[in-house]
């Protein structure tokens, strides 16, 4: 993906090394971010929210790298793009119940068997409150948590334990008692 990103960036090089990015280059940068659409958090955004997000990332890239040519020719350009994406995600997120829904959606947690189906919004909020508290206590920064989430290290990490501990109270164990009268 890094090589693809670099090759695609080089196709839109302007003739002047120091000109600001053209609208075509900015548009291309936003379109290139579509490759990241399936990443945790970004896959939960609506098309409008994603358009705003990719516009902000393109703005950050242009601000950090005013010369599109220098940016496109930079070694490891894909890593730079990735760092800006992570920084943009973490600047939007703090470990709060409302924002954790974008990283770990309720439907996904039900599908994984972490939470039971049919929880009320109030009970879902209780789960996300618990998880936000544990994340804030465990990880030094939300960025560390986002890195784990992006690179699918949640399965074998401390985060999985936190998920299960916070989910445990929501698994109601009901007993079916049948009274047989003789």
Mark where each language-model region is:
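C-terminal motif of bacterial Sec signal peptides marking the signal peptidase cleavage site
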Residues: 12-15
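Mature extracellular/luminal domains of secreted and GPI-anchored eukaryotic proteins, especially small
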Residues: 17-182
């Amino acid at each position: 993906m890094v090589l693809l990103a670099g090759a695609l960036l080089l196709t839109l090089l302007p003739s002047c090394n120091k000109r600001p990015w053209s609208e075509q280059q900015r548009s291309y940068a936003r379109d290139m971010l579509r490759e990241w659409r399936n990443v945790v958090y970004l896959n939960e955004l609506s098309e409008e929210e994603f358009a705003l997000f990719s516009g902000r990332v393109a703005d950050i890239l242009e601000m950090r790298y005013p010369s599109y040519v220098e940016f496109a020719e930079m070694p490891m350009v894909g890593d730079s793009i990735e760092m800006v994406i992570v920084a943009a995600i973490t600047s939007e997120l703090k470990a709060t119940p409302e924002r954790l829904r974008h990283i770990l959606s309720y439907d996904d947690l039900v599908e994984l068997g972490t939470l039971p189906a049919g929880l009320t919004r109030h009970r879902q909020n209780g789960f996300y409150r618990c998880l936000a508290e544990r994340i804030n206590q465990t990880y030094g920064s939300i960025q560390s948590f986002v890195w784990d989430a992006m690179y699918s290290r949640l399965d074998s990490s401390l985060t999985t334990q936190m998920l299960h501990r916070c989910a445990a109270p929501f698994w109601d164990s009901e007993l079916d008692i049948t009274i047989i009268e003789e």
